[in-house]
Amino acid sequence: MTSIPVSSFLLAALVLQYATSDAVNYCRLPCRGDNYHVGCGEPAYAQECGQSPRTRELLKEHRNEILSKINDVRDHVAKGSWGLPVAARMKVVVWDAELAGLAKRHTKGCVGETHACRNTERFWLPGQLNFKYSGDKLPRIKELIDDAVKKGHLQKHNITREIIGNYRENGPNGDVKELALAISDRVTAVGCGLTTWQDGAKARALLTCNFSSQNTRGRPVYKIGNSPGEKCIEKDETYKNLCPATEPIDPNKSN
């Protein structure tokens, strides 16, 4: 008797979770100041895109590669590696189609940092990372992903225990923004987009990843514990130091 409404509820929840940017009128979402929403209007290429711009499809293998790299780092940090404190409740990150759709639209501007807002009805203040490539020849998508991850991974030399407890974008030895965002315990989802183009003799690419949350200056990157995942309802089977993807963490709630 109760199976029908329960099934209907689950279906509605799945539709909401995996909604794409095409299903929402982003022109109606509020943006700070005079900024425009990246999802508002037609997603045309900008003049900065040079010749032959092309937005690339991130296949399942690419999405899995991104998730694997991010969750590996989160699992590593959560257990107290690199001299960082143990994370009490950091969860496995999942792919989100809506964040990916907005990231894809962002890459069509062919400029890394912009003032366009990217908030959604579910994610009020998403974080964003941009990786720009320039070279004689365009590498494979997997190689672009690996290069982007390596850039963030190198920031382990810059991030400190003090930054985990009191976030700022720069440590004593340099930038920590990419790594700090990847290990935020309020991040629950990520979605990425990729556009490539030709600029004279140079091949260029912009890989953008939107995260469900962003770090706030002066606030903790994650909550510290005595043992990894001590505040999780249960532990993930693959990433032993993380909560599973089902852990009910609110990405809009500040630490």
Swiss-Prot record:
Expressed in which tissues? Expressed in salivary glands.
Kindly indicate whether the keyword Lipid metabolism belongs to this entry.
no
Q: Which InterPro entries is this protein grouped with? A: CAP_dom, CAP_sf, P14a_insect
Q: Which GO terms describe its molecular function?
A: toxin activity
Residues recorded as binding leukotriene E4, renumbered to this chain, are W82, H153, K156
Looking up SUPFAM superfamilies in the UniProt record yields: PR-1-like
Question: Which residues belong to any copy of the SCP domain?
Answer: 67-211
Disulfide bond annotation, renumbered to this chain? C27-C40, C31-C117, C49-C110, C192-C209, C232-C243
Q: Which UniProt keywords apply?
A: Disulfide bond, Hemostasis impairing toxin, Platelet aggregation inhibiting toxin, Secreted, Signal, Toxin
What does the UniProt entry say about where the protein is found? Secreted
Signal peptide span: 1-23
Briefly state the protein's biological role.
Anti-inflammatory scavenger of eicosanoids and antithrombotic protein that inhibits platelets aggregation induced by collagen, ADP and convulxin (GPVI agonist). Exhibits high affinity binding for glycoprotein IIb-IIIa receptor (ITGA2B/ITGB3) and endothelial cell alphaVbeta3 (ITGAV/ITGB3) integrins, but not for alpha-5/beta-1 or alpha-2/beta-1. Accordingly, it blocks endothelial cell adhesion to vitronectin (IC(50)~1 nM) and marginally to fibronectin (IC(50)~1 uM), but not to collagen.
Q: What is this protein called in UniProt?
A: Tablysin 15
From which source organism is this entry?
A: Tabanus yao (Horsefly)
